[in-house]
Amino acid sequence: MSTKPKFNTLTVLVVGLWIFGTGDAVIIAAGLGVAPWTVLAQGIGIQFNWTIGQATFFISVIVLFLWIPLKEKPGVGTILNAILIAAAIDVMEPYLPHPEQQIYQLIQVLLGTILVGIGSGFYLTANLGPGPRDGWMTGLQRITNIPIGRVRTTIEIIALLIGWKLGGVFGVGTIIFAILIGPVVALFLQLTDRIWGIN
């Protein structure tokens, strides 16, 4: 992993992370339920009177500390992931529509999921380090030899349940995101890799 990335690679990373955070904000504004980690951020935000972006950044910092016993090493992308996604959520969410009709809420959740997929494709193609949560999951997988899918599912269910108990919003949007995000990320990762060929 390069610690001195090329300008175009860094640009792809930054743009991707901002798109990712904007996608999160679009889903939040829909009001129909959010991604598991965002449910946790909402819950923490409610308890401490923080914005969702502030709570998201807090979670990222805590998770990075959990890298230490796993001997994972953050990259440029790891640090920027923690900062930019949280910033994008707080900057973009107030300017987004907050629909009341369910059909428009569903459309907004789908749009947000697509944006998260596009953003993921960008930042993963840049290959400058995993996000805090992804690095923690892969580190746990390496240490425990438990399949990554099972590790990811277990952690996200725990994050979801804690967030829900703290007041985060679990709903149809959460289920839609959980079902679609894998295929959407895979699609846009393939497309961005073809376009930029950074990897």
Specify the residue positions occupied by each region the protein language model found:
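Core subunits and conserved enzymes of cellular information-processing
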Residues: 1-199
